């Protein structure tokens, strides 16, 4: 075990969230060991856990804030040189045989998110970690067991070419690792969470939505340029499905088809069904951006994967283990906050450790363990509500992206809220998207504020509608030819219109 003056921290999972945790811990003087199930993620041949490249990641203000708190500004600068700024959505459609596109800015002040490649983030983080003397990296190590009372973990070492143990029926070598505390950043199917649940009474909810996703690629133009605007998230919305495209630094676009499993089953029947589906619902994609042969080949070759969301609580056990990122709150990808929420977890976690005196140089090992337990409890108490909130927001945003972006009521509310934000900033009025993407406000607070704003707008719309209908009713009542209209019918129309206004904007 580490001496009282220095903790030994074991981190499981070498994705961006686990790497940021290593940076935070190392900066505070901890000895850090980072274990990853896969091989070195910087090696192109390393197979991702889902056997495909992932949806491009969205990096926004709160994620960048968490990176800045690591104290390594050069890492942020390196990342920001390898991302593409995204200033809004571009909605695509076709009317009367003519293709159209309509931009929707994210923010009235021109602020932006960034489209980031996961592989690039892995490279930048791991290269940085290798330069830090109190961080050790262990690839091809699978967490197989943990005792969170004795603070021990066991890993199978699955090194390439290493032979199984003699007489072990194919088992590979296993190592035992001691730690002061362990951070599980090992994704939605977290082994850390699985073993933690043997010690903690964890409420756990897992749900697969009836939507699969498949990745496609729009290549650069023959002149090595973007074929469509690189400043937007491109959306071809449908009521039950959608196709999106995010730009990459190589001038290509990483695209994703989201659709129910039943639609995928139909599209798998024949090439004709696939091409007809794209022509009907995603006009301008094929053949303008992806050739029919490439579209078909990518649909056949790339896996059709499910989407999972996870809620659980607590996120820790005693003073020995805490889970972060997707291990604690896997969210659907439709708000672009999965990475940002995970990075923010690390900032919130280490803020709690600092606040509770875990890094007080005068603390002995027992006092430090008690402080750590209090810090972990505070982290769970603070973060659970926000983790559940961004989970719910991400689910709701799927409906907005595939259908709401085309609805007049959605566009009206967005216009009004942006106008209030721009012209009357003292009111503190902002759109929900602005609060989520361009602030560090807690997700749970954002939901409460957005509901209140919706009620206010509903009341204002309702009052305005009542005034208009009342004046209209008085005018009609004074007309001899219309006085025979049923007053009850008029009252019913008034109530129906008012109810529609309130429910549509709340």
UniProtKB/Swiss-Prot annotation:
Cofactor(s) listed in the protein's UniProt record: FAD
Catalytic activities: L-kynurenine + NADPH + O2 + H(+) = 3-hydroxy-L-kynurenine + NADP(+) + H2O
GO molecular function: FAD binding; kynurenine 3-monooxygenase activity
Recorded superkingdom: Eukaryota
GO cellular component: mitochondrial outer membrane
Compartment annotation: Mitochondrion outer membrane
EC number: 1.14.13.9
Disulphide bonds in the chain: none
UniProt KW keywords: FAD, Flavoprotein, Membrane, Mitochondrion, Mitochondrion outer membrane, Monooxygenase, NADP, Oxidoreductase, Pyridine nucleotide biosynthesis
Primary location class: mitochondrion
Pathway(s) it belongs to: Cofactor biosynthesis; NAD(+) biosynthesis; quinolinate from L-kynurenine: step 1/3
GO biological process, one term: anthranilate metabolic process
Family per similarity comment: Belongs to the aromatic-ring hydroxylase family. KMO subfamily.
Protein purpose: Catalyzes the hydroxylation of L-kynurenine (L-Kyn) to form 3-hydroxy-L-kynurenine (L-3OHKyn). Required for synthesis of quinolinic acid.
Protein name: Kynurenine 3-monooxygenase
Organism listed in the record: Emericella nidulans (strain FGSC A4 / ATCC 38163 / CBS 112.46 / NRRL 194 / M139) (Aspergillus nidulans)
Gene name for this UniProt entry: bna4
């Amino acid at each position: 075990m580490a001496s009282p003056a220095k903790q030994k921290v074991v981190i499981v999972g070498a994705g961006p969230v686990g790497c940021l945790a290593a940076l935070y811990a190392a900066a505070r003087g901890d000895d850090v060991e980072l274990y990853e199930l896969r091989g070195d993620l910087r090696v192109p041949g390393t197979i991702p856990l889902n056997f495909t490249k992932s949806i491009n990641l969205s990096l926004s203000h709160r994620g960048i804030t968490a990176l800045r708190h690591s104290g390594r500004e050069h890492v942020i600068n390196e990342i920001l040189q390898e991302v593409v700024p995204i200033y809004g959505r571009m909605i695509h459609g076709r009317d009367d045989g003519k293709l159209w596109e309509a931009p929707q800015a994210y923010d009235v002040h021109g602020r932006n998110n960034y489209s980031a490649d996961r592989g690039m983030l892995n490279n930048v983080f791991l290269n940085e970690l290798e330069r830090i003397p109190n961080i050790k990296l262990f690839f091809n190590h699978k967490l197989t067991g943990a005792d969170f009372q004795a603070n021990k973990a066991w890993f199978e070492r699955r090194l390439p070419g290493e032979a199984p143990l003699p007489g072990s029926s194919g088992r590979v070598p296993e190592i035992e690792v001691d730690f002061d505390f362990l951070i599980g950043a090992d994704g939605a199917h977290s082994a850390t969470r699985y073993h933690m649940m043997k010690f903690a009474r964890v409420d756990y909810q897992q749900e697969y939505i009836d939507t699969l996703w498949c990745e496609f690629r729009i290549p650069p133009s023959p002149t090595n340029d973007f074929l469509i605007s690189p400043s937007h998230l491109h959306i071809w919305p449908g009521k039950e499905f959608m196709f999106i495209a995010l730009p990459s630094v190589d001038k290509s676009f990483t695209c994703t088809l989201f659709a129910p499993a039943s639609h995928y089953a139909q599209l798998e029947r024949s090439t004709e069904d696939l091409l007809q589906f794209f022509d009907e619902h995603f006009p301008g994609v094929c053949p303008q951006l992806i050739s029919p042969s490439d579209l078909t080949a990518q649909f056949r070759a790339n896996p059709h994967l499910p989407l999972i969301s996870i809620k659980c609580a607590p996120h820790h056990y005693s003073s020995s283990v805490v889970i972060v990122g997707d291990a604690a709150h896997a969210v659907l990808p439709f708000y672009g906050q999965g990475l940002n929420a995970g990075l923010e977890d690390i900032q919130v976690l280490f803020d709690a450790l600092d606040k509770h005196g875990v890094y007080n140089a005068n603390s002995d090992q027992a006092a430090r363990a008690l402080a750590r337990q209090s810090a972990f409890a505070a982290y769970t108490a603070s973060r659970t509500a926000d983790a559940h909130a961004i989970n719910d927001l991400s689910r709701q945003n799927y409906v907005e992206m595939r259908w709401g972006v085309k609805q007049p009521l959605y566009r009206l509310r967005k216009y009004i809220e942006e106008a209030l934000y721009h012209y009357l900033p003292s009111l503190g009025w902002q759109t929900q998207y602005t609060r989520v993407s361009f602030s560090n406000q807690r997700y749970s607070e954002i939901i409460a504020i957005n509901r209140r704003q919706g009620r206010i707008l509903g009341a204002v719309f309702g009052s305005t509608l009542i005034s208009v209908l009342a004046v209209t009713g008085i005018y009609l009542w004074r007309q001899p030819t219309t006085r025979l209209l049923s007053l009850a019918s008029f009252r019913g129309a008034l109530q129906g219109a008012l109810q529609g206004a309130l429910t549509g904007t709340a």
